[in-house]
Every structure is written in structure tokens, then in C-alpha cells.
Amino acid sequence: MACPFFMPEEKLENGNWLHAGRLPLGCGWSGQCSAPGHEGETPSHEELREFCNLGYAKGCSRLPREREWDSVRFAARTVGDAQNGTEGRIHVRYVCEREHRPAGSGTLEFDAFEARWVGRHRDDRVQRMAECFLQAFLEKKRKRAAAS
């Protein structure tokens, strides 16, 4: 679960995570904070590793007391079929959590053939996290296909 105030920008290749592929966004990311009063600040390498990429960042000094969510988690799956014209669609499911409980959820749809989102999340941060998660998901999928 990534911090809901984290705005990921690019993959972080040297994050020193034991199992980077298991991180909430599919790998480690560098980026900026979007917490009120800290917009555009660049977290340290340690903050990225301990808070931003992991969510439930109660130890982070930037985390506002009043917030809608504590973390956001994602999952993806390929859906659709050729008969109804939805082949190549990927559903990215998100769950926003507060105090370890669901506080909002939904599904974002990506058309892999047209390389575009069918619908976008109302919150730019969640949308960007979904884009990063999808990028990591597709890279893992390509690697698995190449290995078989």
C-alpha cells in the first residue's frame, strides 16, 4: 500500500528492497510529496523506502493529521474478449484505506490496444499510482511471457 500523498515519477532501481517486485506499486519509485504544505518536496531515499512506497507512514513528518486515506493498494488483471470488442482491456482495482479499513474502492480500465485509460480516477495521485502499478504489472507480464 503506497502513501496516498506520494506522487511517483520514475522507477527507483537502487531502492535496496529485499523483494522490490512485491512492493505496493510493483517496484520502488522515486517521486514527490503532495501532502498539504509539502507539495513538490522530494523525499529522501530513506523516506521513499520507509514511507512513500509503503503507506501507513505514521512516522513520516509530512503526513497530515486530517486525511481521507492512509494508503492505497492495487491489483490488476487482463479482461475482455474479442467477441464484444473488449479484448486487451486491463482492470486495475484500487482500494483506499483508512485505519486499516477500506475507505473507498473502484476499478480503472486500461485499453492495451489503444494504450489509453478508458476512465481516470478523480484524484491525480491515485491515477498516477495506478499508471505506475500498471507499468510494473505489464513489465512483469512481458518477462514471464519471454521466459516461457
Task: Go through the PLM ranges and name each one.
Residues 1-148:
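Cysteine-centered metal-binding/redox modules
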